[in-house]
C-alpha cells in the first residue's frame, strides 16, 4: 500500500508514534489509509451540511476495513462573492483547492481519496488535485438545494438577482424583493438550478468518478446519507482493485462529459473547468474545438433553470444523469469504466426515464444542437462561449452599436442608471483571467437586464458569466484585452454582429484598424497584491481553461 511509506518498518517508528497520537492502534497499520477532502464551511449554503455528511463517509470506510482521515479545503460562494472584489478570488480558488488536495494526499501517502465538494470551483479544483495524485478516488458531491416557493412558483437565487432589476425598473416594490429574498434559498445544497455547481456535479458523475444519481440527490435527503456511506465503502473496493483516476479519466470519458453537458444545457463555465481537469491527465486533449464539434451533433434535451422552470429535483425524479445517459444512446461511449468498477453501460442498463417532459427523447429535443456554443470571429479569434440553450430564438442574431466598459462596476452602474437601450451591444473588457485579474462572473448586469425586461441587448466579455445567466451573453472572449486581444480595440459606436446559430462574432473593423488601435492604446493599471498578483502572472487564456503555467 502507498501508506506503507509512513507506517511500515523500523525507520517509520517516528511516523507511527505521531499516528498513535491521532488515535491509531496496532491493528490499524495494516489497513488502507483514506484521505477525505472535505470542503465544509459555515458561509456557503452548498457546504453547510458537509460536516454531518462526512460522518457517513467515515462509517462506510470503517465498515469496509479502512481508516478515514478527514482534512479540509476552502470553498467560496460565487453568489456571496458576486459583484465586488470577492469575485476576483473565485476562479483562482480552484487552483488553491487543487493544490491542497495534491499536497495533503502526497504529503501523507494516502492509499485513496474521497472528495467532498459541492459548489462551483470546488468540484473542478478537487478533481484536478486528484488527477495529479492519481490514487483511487471517489467523489461525493453535496447535492442540490431544493427550490424555494414564491406565490406558487419555483424560486431560486437567480429569482432574487432578477428581482433587484425588476425593482430598479419600478416593476415590483422593495418589500417584494425582500419577500423573494427570504424564500428563494430554503436550506443546504448547491443552488437548485442547472448552474455551475450542479453542472459540474453532473459532469463528475458522467466522467465516472461518483456513484450513479450522486449529482442529483437532494442535499437534505436521507438518500444522500446513504450515498455518502456507500461511497465510503466503495473507496476500499477501488483501493483493492487499484482503479485510479487515470484509468477512468480517458478521452472517451471526457467526450461523454461534454456530450451530457450539451444535452443538459449546462453552465458555460464547463468550458473552463473540463479542459482544466483534462490538462492534468496524460493522453487526453480537450479544447474549445472539441466542445464545438460535440455541440453540433448532440441535441439539447433538458430545460432546467435558468433556461426553463425545471429544477435539479425534477431531473432526479425523471431519471437523473443515468436517465440522460440512457436517452443519449449511441452518442455515449458506454464502455467507459467508472467508480462502480463497472462500465457506464452496465450502470445504466436497467434505468428508465419516468418523465419525458423533463428528459426529452432524442426525436423530440428542445434544440437540435447542444446547449453551449463556441463562437469565433475577429473579436474572439481563439473562441468565446455562450449558453445557447438559455437564449431565446429571437435573440440568436444581433447587430448593433457597441457600448464599451472596462469593468463590471462600470457596466452595472450604467444599467441601473438606465443608460442602456435595446439594440446595444455591451462590451465588458479587462475582466479576463489576467485583466481582472480572476475572470469575474457578470451575473449582476445580466440579471439586472433580465429583471428590467431589457431583452434586445447583447453582452460580450473576456470575463465569464454565471451558470445562472440567460440571454445572448458571450463570455470567455480569447485572447483577453489585457493580452492584446482584439476586444481591446473596440470603441463606442463600432458595429458588432453576433450570430449564435452560425457561431460567429464580429466587429465591423478591418484587421489593419484593429492592429492600429491596439498599438495606440494603454491597458488600465490594476493595483493587485498577494495571491492575485501571483495568479495574474501565471494564469493562461480562457480558451486553455485558465490553467496555470
Curated annotation (Swiss-Prot):
Binding-site positions, Mg(2+): 78, 120-121, 441
One GO-annotated biological process of the protein: L-valine biosynthetic process
Pathway annotation: Amino-acid biosynthesis; L-isoleucine biosynthesis; L-isoleucine from 2-oxobutanoate: step 3/4; Amino-acid biosynthesis; L-valine biosynthesis; L-valine from pyruvate: step 3/4
Modification type N6-carboxylysine: residues: 121
Annotated cofactor note: Binds 1 [2Fe-2S] cluster per subunit. This cluster acts as a Lewis acid cofactor.
Enzyme class (EC, first level): lyase
Cofactor(s) needed: [2Fe-2S] cluster; Mg(2+)
Alphabetized InterPro entries for the sequence: Dihydro-acid_dehy_C (IPR042096), DihydroxyA_deHydtase (IPR004404), DiOHA_6PGluconate_deHydtase_CS (IPR020558), ILV_EDD_C (IPR056740), ILV_EDD_N (IPR000581), IlvD/EDD_N (IPR037237)
E.C. number: 4.2.1.9
Reactions catalysed according to its record: (2R)-2,3-dihydroxy-3-methylbutanoate = 3-methyl-2-oxobutanoate + H2O; (2R,3R)-2,3-dihydroxy-3-methylpentanoate = (S)-3-methyl-2-oxopentanoate + H2O
Name assigned to this protein: Dihydroxy-acid dehydratase
This protein's encoding gene: ilvD
Amino acid at each position: 500500500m502507498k501508506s506503507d511509506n509512513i507506517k511500515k518498518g523500523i525507520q517509520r517508528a517516528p511516523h507511527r508514534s505521531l499516528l498513535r497520537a491521532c488515535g491509531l492502534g496496532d491493528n490499524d497499520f495494516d489497513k488502507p489509509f483514506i484521505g477525505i477532502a472535505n470542503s465544509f464551511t459555515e458561509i456557503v449554503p452548498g457546504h453547510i451540511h458537509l460536516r454531518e455528511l462526512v460522518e457517513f463517509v467515515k462509517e462506510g470506510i470503517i465498515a469496509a476495513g479502512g481508516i478515514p482521515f478527514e482534512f479540509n479545503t476552502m470553498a467560496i460562494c460565487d453568489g456571496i462573492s458576486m459583484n465586488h472584489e470577492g469575485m476576483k478570488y473565485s476562479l483562482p480558488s480552484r487552483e488553491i483547492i487543487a493544490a491542497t488536495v495534491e499536497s495533503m494526499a502526497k504529503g501523507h501517502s494516502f492509499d485513496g481519496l474521497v472528495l467532498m465538494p459541492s459548489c462551483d470551483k470546488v468540484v473542478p479544483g478537487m478533481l484536478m488535485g486528484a488527477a495529479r495524485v492519481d490514487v483511487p478516488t471517489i467523489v461525493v458531491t453535496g447535492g442540490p438545494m431544493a427550490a424555494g416557493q414564491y406565490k406558487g412558483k419555483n424560486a431560486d437565487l437567480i429569482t432574487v438577482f432578477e428581482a433587484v432589476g425588476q425593482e430598479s425598473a419600478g416593476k415590483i416594490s422593495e418589500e417584494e424583493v425582500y419577500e423573494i429574498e427570504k424564500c428563494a434559498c430554503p436550506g443546504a445544497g448547491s443552488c437548485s438550478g442547472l448552474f455551475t455547481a450542479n453542472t459540474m456535479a453532473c459532469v463528475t458523475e458522467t466522467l465516472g468518478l461518483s456513484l450513479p444519481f450522486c449529482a442529483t440527490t437532494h442535499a437534505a435527503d436521507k438518500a444522500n446519507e446513504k450515498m455518502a456511506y456507500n461511497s465510503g465503502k466503495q473507496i476500499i473496493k477501488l483501493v483493492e482493485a487499484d482503479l485510479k483516476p487515470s484509468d477512468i479519466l480517458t478521452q472517451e470519458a471526457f467526450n461523454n462529459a461534454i456530450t451530457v453537458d450539451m444535452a443538459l444545457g449546462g453552465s458555460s463555465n464547463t468550458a473552463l473547468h473540463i479542459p482544466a481537469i483534462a490538462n492534468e491527465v496524460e493522453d487526453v486533449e480537450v479544447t474549445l474545438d472539441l466542445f464545438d464539434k460535440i455541440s453540433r451533433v448532440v441535441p439539447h434535451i433538458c430545460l432546467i433553470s435558468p433556461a426553463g422552470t425545471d429544477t435539479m429535483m425534477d431531473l432526479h425524479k425523471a431519471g437523473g444523469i443515468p436517465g440522460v445517459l440512457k436517452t443519449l444512446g449511441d452518442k455515449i461511449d458506454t464502455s467507459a469504466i467508472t467508480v462502480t468498477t463497472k462500465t457506464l453501460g452496465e450502470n445504466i442498463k436497467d434505468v428508465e426515464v419516468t418523465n419525458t417532459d423533463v428528459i426529452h427523447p432524442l426525436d423530440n429535443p428542445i434544440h437540435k444542437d447542444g446547449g453551449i456554443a463556441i463562437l469565433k470571429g475577429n473579436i474572439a479569434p481563439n473562441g468565446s462561449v455562450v449558453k445557447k440553450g438559455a437564449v431565446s430564438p429571437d435573440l440568436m442574431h444581433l447587430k448593433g452599436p457597441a457600448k464599451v466598459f472596462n469593468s463590471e462596476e462600470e457596466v452595472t452602474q450604467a444599467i441601473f442608471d438606465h443608460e442602456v437601450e435595446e439594440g446595444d451591444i455591451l462590451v465588458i473588457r479587462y475582466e479576463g483571467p489576467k485583466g481582472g485579474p480572476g475572470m469575474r462572473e457578470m451575473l449582476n448586469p445580466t440579471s439586472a437586464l433580465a429583471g428590467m425586461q431589457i431583452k434586445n441587448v447583447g453582452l460580450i466579455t473576456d470575463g465569464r458569466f454565471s451558470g445562472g445567466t440567460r440571454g445572448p451573453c458571450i463570455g470567455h472572449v480569447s485572447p483577453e484585452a489585457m493580452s492584446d486581444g482584439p476586444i481591446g480595440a473596440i470603441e463606442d459606436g463600432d458595429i458588432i454582429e453576433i450570430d449564435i446559430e452560425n457561431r460567429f462574432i464580429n466587429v465591423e473593423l478591418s484587421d489593419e484598424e484593429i492592429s492600429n488601435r491596439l498599438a495606440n492604446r494603454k491597458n488600465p493599471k490594476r493595483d493587485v497584491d498577494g495571491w492575485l498578483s501571483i495568479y495574474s502572472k501565471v494564469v493562461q487564456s480562457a480558451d486553455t481553461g485558465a490553467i496555470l503555467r
